[in-house]
Amino acid sequence: MAVELKELTKRSENYSQWYNDLVVKADLAEQSPVRGCMVIKPYGYAIWEKMQRQLDDMFKETGHVNAYFPLLIPKSYLSREAEHVEGFAKECAVVTHYRLKNAEDGSGVIVDPAAKLEEELIIRPTSETIIWSTYKNWINSYRDLPILCNQWANVMRWEMRTRLFLRTAEFLWQEGHTAHATREEAEAEAQKMLHVYGDFAEKYMAVPVIKGVKSANERFAGALDTYTIEGLMQDGKALQCGTSHFLGQNFAKAFNVQFVDKNNKLDYVWATSWGVSTRLMGALIMTHSDDNGLVLPPHLAPIQVVIVPIYKNDEMLKKIDAKVEGIVNKLKAMGISVKYDNADNKRPGFKFADYELKGVPVRLVMGGRDLENNTMEVMRRDTLEKETRSCDGIEEYVQQLLEDIQNNIYQKALNYRNEHIVKVDSYDDFKEQIEKGGFILAHWDGTPETEDRIKEETKATIRCLPFDADEESLTPGKCMVTGKPSARRVLFARAY
């Protein structure tokens, strides 16, 4: 059933409802019969595929290869790394039986009690344990290192409060798992992959991010350090867009993965893991979109240019078809994804609204008068500005326009982010400022107790200790809550 554009809630009225409306009405995703699991629709999946393709290229350029590991993990594997199991225990889905049978009373299918597994299996919440049990078979000597593997997969975390793309029980992601001979090499890998994520977010998603290291409280379960990229959404909330973890030797020790080093000594392997998920779709939607619908960065838009004819009869349509064919072919030859929508089952006005809703970056329109004048109407989705251009050289103009749109939406998001970072020195000012949204740089005494208190009283968390902090932020001061010494300012926000 067709969706009317007017049904979209305004951001200023209810931002959360606007987001939910937009995901469904732009045909990105919908709820499924399984609580917390979503159906990613073809248009939404096409955006994810473009993200996936670009990230995959970036991983391969940095020497990584793809592999695939089992969905099911023996329960005993999770017990081997105490912090890890503690971090994920409450979210694990457990497989206990391997067979169904028809009920004797004809009431339907039941679990066969005779088919109980000897050991329960966990549907992967993340794959460190199954991968490190495998790496044990692959690694004997320093010559076997490094191992630089990535996996594209689905994972299951039994979330109680779910939202499409942002927090779902099942989601798609990639997870990199690397093994190294030295601590220095592993730490460098974890930071390198964080910078890959940062480059992807800024150059392709047009989402400005702050890179930094997580506090101990916010660290990944089983990691020695967690690095993060943090984006700021239009409602002033932060969104963690990707993380990279330096795991030390924790998993190598848990699974006894040792190697003979260059000095012929036995040592445990050093590890990293890193991942981004379909949560990036949420970041993309919330960073750029407006009350008319999606605003997609051209680098990730499934359709970069749509062409719509306006005609009075079949004869006029044939002439427009002939004129447009050459333009379509030239755009495709430039590597631009273009759709010519001459279907007669929808009126032009409906098509305009639908492509605006779906965030197509550039719309070209040709009518009878345009045909006579050798012109087209050009509309850019980010500003909704229209102009009439000659068809001569329009392909080069559109190519440049797509780059201008990509740069413009990044700059707009960057300006918003920079306007919503403030420094505060007192807890009262912090509590007042956090209600306005945005990032806050403030002093903290470094203790988890103070961090927990701030979270409990304000719902704000430490997003990271930013890498690119200014000199004043790196200067020691006093904790805004306790007055105790603080090594530096850290970045706070309320977050998704």
UniProtKB/Swiss-Prot annotation:
Cellular component GO terms held in the UniProt record: aminoacyl-tRNA synthetase multienzyme complex; cytoplasm
Domain of life (superkingdom): Bacteria
Keyword Protein biosynthesis part of the UniProt annotation: yes
Chief site of localization: cytoplasm
BP GO terms, sorted: prolyl-tRNA aminoacylation
InterPro entries: aa-tRNA-synt_IIb, aa-tRNA-synth_II, aa-tRNA-synth_II/BPL/LPL, Anticodon-bd, Anticodon-bd_dom_sf, Pro-tRNA-ligase_IIa_arc-type, Pro-tRNA_ligase_II_C, Pro-tRNA_synth_II
Note on domains (UniProt): Consists of three domains: the N-terminal catalytic domain, the anticodon-binding domain and the C-terminal extension.
Family: Belongs to the class-II aminoacyl-tRNA synthetase family. ProS type 3 subfamily.
Assembly description: Homodimer.
Protein's UniProt name: Proline--tRNA ligase
Lineage of the species this protein comes from: Bacteria, Pseudomonadati, Bacteroidota, Bacteroidia, Bacteroidales
Gene name in the database record: proS
